[in-house]
Amino acid sequence: MNATNTAARKATWAVPAVLILLSLLFRLPSLVEGGGFGRLVSPSLDAALLALAVCLYTWAGLPGFTVVGAVLALLGVTVLSFQAADALIPLFFNRPFELFTDITYLPDLYALLRDTMSGWMFYAGLILLVAGLGGLGVGLYAGFRHLRRGFQDRTVRYGFLILLAVLVVLDLTTQVRFTANTAVPRMAEEAGKIAKKEQFVQEQQEAFSRQVQDSSRVMRPLEGLEGADVYLFIVESYGYTLYSEPMHFSLIEPELRQFQNRLTREGFRIASTFLDSPAFGGNSWLSDSTLATGVRIDNEAAYDLLHESDVKPIAQFFNEIGYRTVVAMPATTYAWPEGEFYRFEQKYYYKDFDYEGPNLKWAPMTDQYVVDFIHRNEVQGASQPLFIQYVMISSHYPFNMIPRFFEDWSQIGDGSIYHREDSVNVLPIKPGNQTAGAEGFVAAMAYELKLIREYLSNFVEGEALIIVVGDHQPYSGITGKNKPRSVPLHVISRRSDFVTPFVDRGYSEGLIPRQELPHAGLETFLPSLLESFSSVELASDPRSAAVKAGRATN
């Protein structure tokens, strides 16, 4: 009898301990959002609801608990995973978590980590993740069993229900926000978006139809270029912060001045602006496809729909007027059949570069090697005007492996020179940090800008039009929280009249953009390019507004 009483007392005292641990567990994601200790210790409604389910099941006297406990544990893991994503996505990508679209990134994330991490590290991390989620589920199940034993005591059940009632009353009459400490409304919101999938698809297809209609009005596209070569450099992580944050700007300003002064002396005219990218901190393909099509592609679902549409990408306009269209994408290390949509005549992916140098983790090869390879294989001896798009990668997160720039381009060869110890500057990542910080970020940007400057100065002859644009801001650990998505865009040419249409549109003279927030969308660039050099004027601004309006309803 005494043993029975002792067990009952232990079960009774276990209830408050389990409730406190559950509440702390479900409030852990709040630390990411800020608010400190106060938010952590505020009671969790999610934990209370799960405990209430155990209480009511026990009170009803229903037999068994194994299946119910497992279901509640699975539900708890699901809620915690949702809370973690809801806290971390805004931190890294400066946008809300969207279950409908973000869950589709998981296969790409898996492939990216598999390709960029060493084998043992990747599989060890995968095992730890599975073990962690499994351990979390087992821990929750054990906690719920403790609650069930404790709730068999009527006094404990009543005490728990009274506690819930007190918390609800305090929520209604004071500033204690018990009912706000839950993921339920956000989960319901995301479930509602999934239910509206058909509406989203219809709105996106309407946006694509507008682009197709506009494209059909361009009978002689880009004839104003008069056969001049066009080079498009899309620079990884080249964002607004480089110009707007005083610390970043002070570090990069010498390179910016050198870039402008060098090219101006050699007869180039430069105009610059900021445009609002659909991506932040990653997801470069969204900004690349937005730039290529003139339709804002701001999530994976829209990206997939785009590839099934009749939208005409930028390369096709050049194809139609006799250009050879080339894209260089060294970071594309696996089969990418969707690339056919973009209509490039010649595509260079990782396997096509004959690179014999080291893999620099996130950057499989250096951008100077890529530019040199394309110049030797495409630019030299070209018999057609060229449209070449470079998707640059050396400035990728975590900004800690900065290639050496070789003044003598003939040294680059097959890339094996990068095996030399002095060919890559490896910056330290301090314990607890994810990147090489502002120093690494600015060093990566300086490398890319110097590479473009030196290539234009030494190898681009004649009347070419050069476009340099960022794909997205670096992640929020570099920019800070709640920063704009804007990226710089520069148009450069020795033909002043190629730059004039952009200045007339509000671009700033020179390399440093001056436009105030808010900025026009990245999707406006292709229409403006077509308007500037084609004989038919497009309704670019209304279309852009319509696309944004459609997006706002999602």
Predicted regions and their residues:
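Transmembrane and membrane-interface helices of multi-pass
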Residues: 2-186
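Membrane-interface segments at or immediately adjacent to transmembrane helices
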Residues: 106, 164-237, 243-246, 254
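Generic detector of well-ordered alpha-helical segments enriched in charged/polar residues
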Residues: 42-45, 49, 72, 82, ...
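Generic secondary-structure transition motif, activating predominantly at the C-termini of alpha-helices
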Residues: 85, 105, 110-117, 148-151, ...
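A diffuse structural propensity rather than consistent per-protein peaks
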Residues: 96-102, 193, 284, 349, ...
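Solvent-exposed soluble domains appended to multi-pass membrane proteins
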Residues: 213-228, 232-235, 240-554
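Short N-terminal signal/transit or membrane-insertion segments
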Residues: 8-19, 156-178, 198-207, 220-224, ...
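Short secondary-structure boundary segments
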Residues: 11-41, 117, 183, 187-217, ...
